């Protein structure tokens, strides 16, 4: 089919990342080079705050044994006993000679082993990335630097904003100098043209304003679509991971004055507020009820009245916020501003879980006299696996008629068996609704007509019957309006579908057509697509896992599925991210690795205007790399049970094939996740490899993302079984390598990774892994939330054996490990401390004591409260050093042994 009108030819649409890298054959590594930045970073900083994370500081390694050169040698750090009585000189000579012979024999055996053709499992397609070229001359990174953000690249967010008259390429900038305005809208192209007639629109001149003597300092801002009023949030307080409350204000651009969103209740905290597409009203939720404020009046209209502790309107409860929408809003305006769709959530039947706070007062209330010594308890409606779920239904508000209504859909799921995962407005009063059954393996897509108040299911997909898998909740479907002049006769939408065992993009038109045009045939899996849609030129932009699963590249495709073209340079193994302007004529391109990240604003290939501006080059980070020595990264595959699994091996600087290195396995491993990627990242694993001198291995095993649904879905109903087998088999492969000390192999993970660490050492029983570390682990999936757990495990009532197998329960096997460590925050609202406490109780009942535990008072799942983040990593590092130094090697005969041979061994620094 011919290209759409206005589309550039394929020859003109060349990759936009040409010459961003150069190769040096001498080290087989990539070295980044680019031009100098030309933009002040202040005006591009994230509209709602910086993305630069900070963390706590490092603690020292302590006063331990050192090698002759003054450096603590952890590459061969066996346990060294301290002390011992003097031995007579002759005995020293004789025993020294005997020990020399023994050591010589051991060395000969080692050499024969090393060069004797020792077999290991085959690996393929090995890729070596080394981002530092200082050799042995560079400084060592410290844990302090890793935790305080010293090694974090500077990243900035551009907030694209649609123009009042359909203009494309407009930026919302915050934090500019007073002379240019605190908040303004600027045309991207005019930034580099001082003679441009398109001048910036200043929305807020100052960084604060006063209302009746109260100074208002914005924490978040949302301009109205017509850019005449700004919705402002101040006094923000965090609720859960994504939700917050605060005071909301309306700021008039022309007069530069503000007023409360609700003048009659200006001090009451609001949970959510959003603009009408007409710019004439704001809908908001307060105390779980919805209200409407029209700008033409100071009065506030009540939309709902019965919201409260158990009934939510327009905002999600805990489990929907965490597991379905990853955000604080379930409110959607129709494009014409005539209707509002929202979820009503009834969690009356959901059991409560108490989260206790022993140090802090999260509710902000002072205890009553005499009750100061009692912990504060916050009760959460938390549906665990198999427990009653919240009842959620979709409702609508007719703005003109001031009326709330709902629409029944014939053949839909029962209330207790329904998850509403996406709502997308189409045109002419139609709305597309995606829902699944409770176990997320049957999908319904319905189209509702709010004008006629009717609805029908237009797509049904049984994912369990298709491949035994599930469907993940997502909010990426994109409505495509009809445009006969450009060949689109009907409305439609773009969605992610399962095609030939992978997630692909598909175009459904008209909206009730169940048979789509698959847009991305033959490509690797798409990632949160589509990323951008150019309606004018008939193009869809998407991010895809590239030639290898650890890559990310950007492509475009026509609406008819023809002419798939790369936007980034796919000849380089790279990791990109992107955000597109509203018309997709411009893109904010982020190169995230493997070399030093950079960011640019560019015109897209089909745009007639050519534009490129560098936003960030991270020159500070590049200079730092020239002074430090980092680990080398080896990307490869291993074959286990017929599956090709991605692996990242981090090797210490000055890696020596003839040495024996301890190995730390690091994993997350959750369904659909990915840990092996090409992002630039100097993290705790980098510290372990580059400073402590250990090898770190990460395996994305079965169940993880971007290696095909066959490998992903095999884990269903039996979490931890295949994933732990993959880690164990990988550890056996590494244990057989000549440069690995098979007696010093450990594994660690956080959250799902904590579960995986425990499940792996449980299944292995000390045969391969000797140590393990689990932070905030799930230990029994009956304790985790229903929406996440049942997606992968079904319900406990349906699959009791699977839940039994997945629980960490084989204490006999755990006792066969040398030692393991468990750490958890006591106020974890996500993975409850119940998991670790019941697990430790099992250990106590079965007289297992080869473990350590550390609880962090009042810390949630991220473990930050009162210096906890620093402690969790420093404790992890110290514990790992102690483990690999043999601190906890079992002594089967603890009776004192004063033999001459033992004392001689102590004298020469050996352990018997």
Curated annotation (Swiss-Prot):
The entry's keywords: Aminopeptidase, Glycoprotein, Hydrolase, Membrane, Protease, Serine protease, Signal-anchor, Transmembrane, Transmembrane helix, Vacuole
EC number: 3.4.14.5
GO annotation, biological process: proteolysis
Vacuolar face residues: 114-912
PROSITE patterns: PRO_ENDOPEP_SER
Coiled coil regions in record: none
Cytoplasmic side: 1-92
GO CC annotations, alphabetized: plasma membrane; vacuolar membrane
Transmembrane segments: 93-113
Pfam families hit by this protein: DPPIV_N, Peptidase_S9
GO MF, any single term: serine-type endopeptidase activity
Regions of compositional bias (Basic and acidic residues) in chain numbering: 1-25
Function: Type IV dipeptidyl-peptidase which removes N-terminal dipeptides sequentially from polypeptides having unsubstituted N-termini provided that the penultimate residue is proline.
Name the record gives this protein: Probable dipeptidyl-aminopeptidase B
Originating organism: Paracoccidioides lutzii (strain ATCC MYA-826 / Pb01)
Source taxonomy: Eukaryota, Fungi, Dikarya, Ascomycota, Pezizomycotina
């Amino acid at each position: 089919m011919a290209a759409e009108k206005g589309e550039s030819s394929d020859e003109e649409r060349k990759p936009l990342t040409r010459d961003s890298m150069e190769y040096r054959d001498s080290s087989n590594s990539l070295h980044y080079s680019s031009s100098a930045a030309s933009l002040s970073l202040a005006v591009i900083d994230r509209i709602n705050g910086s993305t630069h994370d900070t963390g706590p500081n490092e603690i020292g390694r302590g006063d331990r044994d050192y090698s002759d050169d003054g450096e603590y040698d952890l590459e061969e750090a066996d346990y060294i006993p301290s002390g011992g009585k003097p031995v007579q000189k002759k005995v020293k000579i004789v025993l020294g000679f005997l020990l020399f012979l023994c050591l010589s024999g051991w060395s000969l055996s080692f050499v024969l082993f090393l060069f004797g053709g020792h077999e290991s499992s085959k690996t393929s397609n090995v890729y070596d990335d080394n981002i530092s070229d200082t050799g042995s001359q560079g400084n060592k990174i410290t844990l302090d630097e890793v935790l305080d953000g010293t090694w974090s690249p500077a990243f900035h967010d551009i907030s694209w904003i649609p123009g009042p008259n359909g203009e494309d390429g407009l930026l919302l900038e915050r934090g500019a100098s007073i002379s240019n305005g605190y908040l303004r809208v600027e045309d991207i192209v005019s930034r580099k043209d001082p003679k441009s007639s398109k001048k910036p629109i200043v929305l807020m001149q100052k960084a604060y304003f006063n209302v009746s003597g109260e100074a208002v300092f914005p924490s978040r801002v949302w301009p109205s679509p017509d850019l005449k009023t700004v919705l402002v949030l101040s006094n923000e307080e965090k609720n859960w991971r994504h939700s917050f409350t605060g005071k909301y204000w309306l700021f008039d651009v022309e007069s530069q004055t503000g007023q409360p969103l609700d003048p009659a209740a200006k001090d009451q905290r609001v949970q959510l507020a959003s603009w009408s597409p007409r710019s004439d009203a704001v809908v908001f939720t307060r105390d779980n009820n919805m209200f409407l404020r029209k700008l033409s009046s100071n009065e506030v209209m009540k939309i709902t009245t019965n919201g409260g502790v158990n009934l939510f309107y327009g905002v999600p409860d805990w489990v929907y916020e965490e597991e379905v929408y990853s955000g604080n809003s379930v409110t959607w305006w129709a494009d014409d501003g005539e209707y509002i769709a929202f979820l009503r959530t009834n969690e009356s039947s959901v059991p409560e879980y108490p989260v206790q706070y022993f140090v802090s007062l999260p509710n902000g209330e002072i205890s009553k006299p005499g009750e100061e010594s009692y912990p504060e308890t916050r009760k959460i409606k938390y549906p665990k696996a198999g427990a009653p779920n919240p009842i959620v239904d979709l409702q609508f508000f007719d703005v003109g008629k001031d009326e709330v209504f709902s629409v029944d859909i014939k053949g839909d799921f029962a209330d207790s068996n329904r998850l509403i995962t996406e709502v997308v407005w189409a045109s002419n009063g139609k709305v597309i609704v995606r829902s699944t059954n409770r176990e997320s393996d049957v999908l319904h897509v319905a189209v509702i007509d709010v004008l006629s108040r009717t609805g029908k299911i237009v797509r049904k997909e049984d994912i369990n019957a298709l491949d035994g898998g599930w469907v993940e909740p997502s909010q990426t479907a994109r409505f495509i309006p009809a445009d006969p002049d450009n060949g689109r006769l009907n409305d439609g939408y773009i969605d992610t579908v399962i095609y030939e065992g992978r997630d692909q993009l598909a175009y459904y038109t008209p909206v009730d057509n169940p048979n789509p045009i698959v847009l991305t045939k033959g490509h690797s899996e798409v990632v949160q697509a589509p990323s951008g849609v150019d309606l004018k030129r008939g193009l869809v932009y998407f991010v895809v896992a590239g030639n290898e699963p650890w890559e990310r590249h950007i492509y475009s495709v026509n609406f008819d599925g023809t002419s798939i073209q790369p936007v980034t340079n796919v000849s380089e193994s790279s990791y990109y991210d992107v955000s597109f302007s509203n018309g997709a004529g411009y893109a904010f391109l982020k190169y995230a690795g493997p070399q030093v990240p950079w960011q640019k604003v560019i015109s897209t290939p089909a745009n007639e205007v050519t534009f490129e501006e560098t936003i960030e080059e991270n020159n500070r980070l590049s200079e730092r790399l020239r002074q430090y020595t980092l680990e080398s990264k080896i990307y490869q595959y291993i074959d286990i049970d017929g599956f090709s699994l991605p692996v990242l091996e981090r090797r210490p600087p000055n890696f020596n094939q003839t040495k024996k290195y301890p190995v730390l396995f690091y994993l997350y491993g959750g369904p659909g996740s990915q840990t092996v990627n090409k992002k630039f990242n100097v993290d705790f694993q980098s510290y372990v490899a580059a400073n402590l001198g250990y090898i770190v291995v990460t395996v994305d095993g079965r169940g993880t993302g971007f290696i095909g649904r066959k490998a992903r879905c095999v884990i269903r109903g039996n979490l931890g079984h295949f994933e732990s087998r993959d880690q164990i088999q990988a550890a056996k492969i590494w244990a057989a390598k000549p440069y690995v000390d098979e007696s010093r192999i450990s594994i660690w993970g956080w959250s799902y990774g904590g579960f995986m660490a425990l499940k792996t050492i449980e299944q292995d029983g000390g045969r391969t892994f000797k140590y393990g570390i689990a932070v905030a682990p799930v230990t029994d999936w009956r304790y985790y939330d229903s929406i996440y757990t049942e997606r992968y495990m079904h319900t406990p009532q349906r699959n009791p054996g699977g839940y039994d197998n997945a629980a960490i329960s084989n204490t006999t096997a755990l006792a066969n490990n040398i030692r393991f460590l468990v750490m958890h925050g006591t106020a974890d609202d996500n993975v409850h401390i119940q998991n670790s406490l019941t697990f430790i109780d099992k250990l106590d009942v079965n007289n297992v004591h080869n473990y350590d535990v550390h609880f962090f008072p009042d810390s949630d799942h991220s473990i930050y409260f009162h210096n906890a983040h620093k402690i969790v990593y420093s404790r992890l590092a110290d514990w790992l050093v102690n483990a690999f130094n043999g601190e906890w090697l079992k002594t089967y005969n603890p009776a004192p042994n004063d033999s001459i041979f033992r004392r001689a061994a102590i004298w020469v620094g050996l352990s018997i």
